[in-house]
Every structure is written in structure tokens, then in C-alpha cells.
Swiss-Prot record:
Catalytic residue list: Y194
E.C. number(s) listed in UniProt: 1.1.1.184, 1.1.1.196, 1.1.1.197, 1.1.1.71
Catalytic activity: a secondary alcohol + NADP(+) = a ketone + NADPH + H(+); a primary alcohol + NADP(+) = an aldehyde + NADPH + H(+); prostaglandin F2alpha + NADP(+) = prostaglandin E2 + NADPH + H(+); prostaglandin E1 + NADP(+) = 15-oxoprostaglandin E1 + NADPH + H(+)
Organism: Homo sapiens (Human)
Residues found modified as N6-1-carboxyethyl lysine: K239
Matching Pfam families: adh_short (PF00106)
A GO term for molecular function: prostaglandin E2 9-reductase activity
Tissue: Expressed in kidney (at protein level).
Protein name: Carbonyl reductase [NADPH] 1
Family the entry assigns: Belongs to the short-chain dehydrogenases/reductases (SDR) family.
Length: 277
């Protein structure tokens, strides 16, 4: 076990913003960088691409929808490094605007990965985070827009400083159920499934940061959600304003906050600035 070596890990690291984050961490992080991807072939191809640039990330398979896959990664990190220093939860999906898939199916599929998959990764890997560790959950400005489109009752719940993880899970499940019944708008939900899943990611980040402050107060772990901006990726398309490299800036900034930093913690960060939630 090479537990003296620091290690950073990025989910969904084989393309787009994830790949740009891995590239930056390989250059700036003093330790090993693990690129994870659902598809082994694509993940290893991304590693080879970075190796051709003179960088040396490691690869490990990870499908955030598969608990066994998450646990295999957890065991690898524990055995190889005795824990984890930096976790960047970047993996996520979105349907294209013109996608003909029925809305309730889009809601269920997007929620499964973006919220529940990310939550499962946190459940398994947060206990491994070492003192002065950094956790970055890549959310979206769409979460802020979706929040503003929620009913006042839902907004109040999502902004609550005391909402529990169980309550948040209940709300995320309710959204999916409401879409199946065709009553989501009547129930105060916005019509962006992606936006609601990212509300989930942002609020989950606030909850986990609060728990870390309560349960591991002296460990100086900082956990935040962030928006990378509108980035030219397979997800956002070619018209977006930022390159993947520019999209990686805020996540990497949060991943590399100096050891003595007091914050940000439990915040939603965009363009390296704390945004009001």
C-alpha cells in the first residue's frame, strides 16, 4: 500500500470537462490522478491520449449506476492508497432538447445517474477522504434556474439549512413519480429534468458539507458544488461559449484549494465565485 502518495480521482473522465479536469490535475496535483470511465476501452483511450501529451494518469473502471463497480473502486483506493485526497464527481448525463424520449423516462434515467449515482459514489467514497481532502460535485447553473422555477414550497425545502439526505431523496423520488403521473407542473416542479437532478446534486453537497463540519470538524475537508459554465461538449453541443479547458477551471480550483483554506465549504461556486443558493 503506497499510502504516502496523494491521490485524486475524477468520475466521467474520458471526455469533455472530465478529461480536461484530469489533464489539469495531472499537471498541477502532486500525486497520482485516477481517470475513471464507465467504458474501459474509451477510458483507456483517454489515458493514452494524455500519455501522448506527456502526462501519466492511472485508469480504473467506474460506472456510477453500478454499486458493485463503485465498491470495487473503493476497495482499490483503500488498498492502494489507504484513502482518497481529492474526489471530483463529474459523471452525468443529459438528454438533448429535441430527444423524443417521453419526459417521465428522461426524468427517471437522468435522476438515476446524476443524483442517485453521484449519491452512491459519495456514500462509498466520502468515508475514505483524508484530512484536508477536497470534494467537488460538478452541478450546473441549471440547478439555480430550476430552483427559481420551483414552487415557493419546494424552494423553501431545497434552501433549508436542516434538510436531511433522506428528505432530499424523498423529494427526488417524488419528482420522478410526479412526472409518471403527469402532475409534475401542478406539484410545483419545473419542466427541466436535468435541472431538477442538479438541484439534487447541489443540495446533497450542502448536506454532506454540513455533516463533515459536524462529524469531522478538525479534518479541514472542503466540499463544494460548482457550475463549470456552458461548455462545448457532447452534452451541450458546439454552440456553447466555453472550451472544456475553461469549463475545468472552477472544478480544478476547488479540487486544489490550499491546505490552510477555511473555505469555500458547502457552497455553490461558479467562475471561482460563491453564488447565492
Amino acid at each position: 500500500m503506497s499510502s504516502g502518495i496523494h491521490v485524486a480521482l475524477v468520475t466521467g473522465g474520458n471526455k469533455g470537462i472530465g478529461l480536461a479536469i484530469v489533464r489539469d490535475l495531472c499537471r498541477l496535483f502532486s500525486g497520482d490522478v485516477v481517470l475513471t470511465a464507465r467504458d474501459v476501452t474509451r477510458g483507456q483511450a483517454a489515458v493514452q491520449q494524455l500519455q501522448a501529451e506527456g502526462l501519466s494518469p492511472r485508469f480504473h473502471q467506474l460506472d456510477i449506476d453500478d454499486l458493485q463497480s463503485i465498491r470495487a473502486l473503493r476497495d482499490f483506493l483503500r488498498k492502494e492508497y489507504g484513502g482518497l485526497d481529492v474526489l471530483v464527481n463529474n459523471a452525468g448525463i443529459a438528454f438533448k432538447v429535441a430527444d423524443p424520449t417521453p419526459f417521465h423516462i428522461q426524468a427517471e434515467v437522468t435522476m438515476k445517474t446524476n443524483f442517485f449515482g453521484t449519491r452512491d459514489v459519495c456514500t462509498e467514497l466520502l468515508p475514505l477522504i483524508k484530512p484536508q481532502g477536497r470534494v467537488v460535485n460538478v452541478s450546473s447553473i441549471m440547478s439555480v434556474r430550476a430552483l427559481k422555477s420551483c414552487s415557493p414550497e419546494l424552494q423553501q425545502k431545497f434552501r433549508s439549512e436542516t434538510i436531511t439526505e433522506e428528505e432530499l431523496v424523498g423529494l427526488m423520488n417524488k419528482f420522478v413519480e410526479d412526472t409518471k403521473k403527469g402532475v409534475h407542473q401542478k406539484e410545483g416542479w419545473p419542466s427541466s429534468a436535468y435541472g431538477v437532478t442538479k438541484i439534487g446534486v447541489t443540495v446533497l453537497s450542502r448536506i454532506h458539507a454540513r455533516k463533515l463540519s459536524e462529524q469531522r470538524k478538525g479534518d479541514k475537508i472542503l466540499l463544494n458544488a460548482c457550475c463549470p459554465g456552458w461548455v462545448r461538449t457532447d452534452m451541450a453541443g458546439p454552440k456553447a461559449t466555453k472550451s472544456p479547458e475553461e469549463g475545468a477551471e472552477t472544478p480544478v480550483y476547488l479540487a486544489l484549494l490550499p491546505p490552510d483554506a477555511e473555505g469555500p465549504h458547502g457552497q455553490f461556486v461558479s467562475e471561482k465565485r460563491v453564488e447565492q443558493w
